[in-house]
């Protein structure tokens, strides 16, 4: 999948699940489960409940996503 096909949207982390998976509420009110991208995992970026994040969604499954950026 190319980058042009993915959907990027802002959200807030609601809950931390096992294996670096998070429950994120998007700007439009939907709640999705998202995992950390490989570069964030490699650089030990910590994500806590309440953090603002950028989530990348695929058009095939809008309930799962990848966290690509944590806002300050």
UniProtKB/Swiss-Prot annotation:
The keyword Cytoplasm applies. GO terms for molecular function: ribosome binding; rRNA binding; translation initiation factor activity. Disulfide bonds: none annotated. One of the essential components for the initiation of protein synthesis. Stabilizes the binding of IF-2 and IF-3 on the 30S subunit to which N-formylmethionyl-tRNA(fMet) subsequently binds. Helps modulate mRNA selection, yielding the 30S pre-initiation complex (PIC). Upon addition of the 50S ribosomal subunit IF-1, IF-2 and IF-3 are released leaving the mature 70S translation initiation complex. HAMAP family: IF_1. Component of the 30S ribosomal translation pre-initiation complex which assembles on the 30S ribosome in the order IF-2 and IF-3, IF-1 and N-formylmethionyl-tRNA(fMet); mRNA recruitment can occur at any time during PIC assembly. Belongs to the IF-1 family. This is Translation initiation factor IF-1.
């Amino acid at each position: 999948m190319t980058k042009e096909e993915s959907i990027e949207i802002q959200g807030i982390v609601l809950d931390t699940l096992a294996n670096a998976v998070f429950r994120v509420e998007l700007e439009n009110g939907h709640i999705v489960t998202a995992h950390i991208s490989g570069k964030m995992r490699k650089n030990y970026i910590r994500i806590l409940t309440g953090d603002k994040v950028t989530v990348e969604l695929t058009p095939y499954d809008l309930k799962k996503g990848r966290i690509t950026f944590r806002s300050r």
